[in-house]
Curated annotation (Swiss-Prot):
Name of the gene encoding the protein in the UniProt record: fbiD
Name used for this protein in its record: Phosphoenolpyruvate guanylyltransferase
Keywords carried by this UniProt record: GTP-binding, Nucleotide-binding, Nucleotidyltransferase, Transferase
Alphabetized GO MF terms: GTP binding; phospholactate guanylyltransferase activity
Domain of life where this protein originates: Bacteria
Residues binding phosphoenolpyruvate: T150, G165, S168
Catalytic reaction annotation: phosphoenolpyruvate + GTP + H(+) = enolpyruvoyl-2-diphospho-5'-guanosine + diphosphate
Organism, as annotated: Mycobacterium leprae (strain TN)
EC id: 2.7.7.105
Pathway: Cofactor biosynthesis; coenzyme F420 biosynthesis
Amino acid sequence: MSGTRAGGTADVGLIIAVKRLAAAKTRLGPVFSTRTRENVVLAMLVDTLTAAAPVSALRSITVITPDEAAAAAAAEFGAEILADPTPDGHGDPLNNAIAAAEHAIAGSFSNIVVLQGDLPALQTQELSEAIAAARHHQRSFVADRLGSGTAALCTFGTALNPQFGPDSSAQHRRSGAIELTGPWPGLRCDVDTPADLAAARRLGIGAATTRVVAHL
């Protein structure tokens, strides 16, 4: 399925990398069974895509994943689905997946945004504003709410050079990316831990995640 949408002013390709659901968000294990945790991860992806899809700057959405359920959910939004070629045991699987997606779409897009797929409180306007701010720089990023991680990495006319992983905010800053300083609380609230999920719920989470965590 093609992830390219019509729109004369849309000039950005969005990439979301999603790992296999069974291996994702293990730090949520203390509050969820394995099956529920997988459902939470999938629901957060759906809510992220629900917020991102209406952003007028986006010409395409590409989801790279080895997971069939995640791929099927993303396809419902018209996303281009790429099978993650990263082998098991790879030392840097997230950045490798992002680089593979960048290579796949770089021939069509010189402007690319990488977005985390675990942003259940994301608002469409936040992502629109962040992309507008990113246009003033060749390469920029949005830190997470704790200031240590990265919620989004944006490039306009240059390579992504993704540095996701531990202390990715500092890594992106050291690599020359400009930190974007807008408030955007939902964009900054990625969910890795029960505390992150509580913070997202205080902001207001999307319908898919709400259905899964309603019993908490």
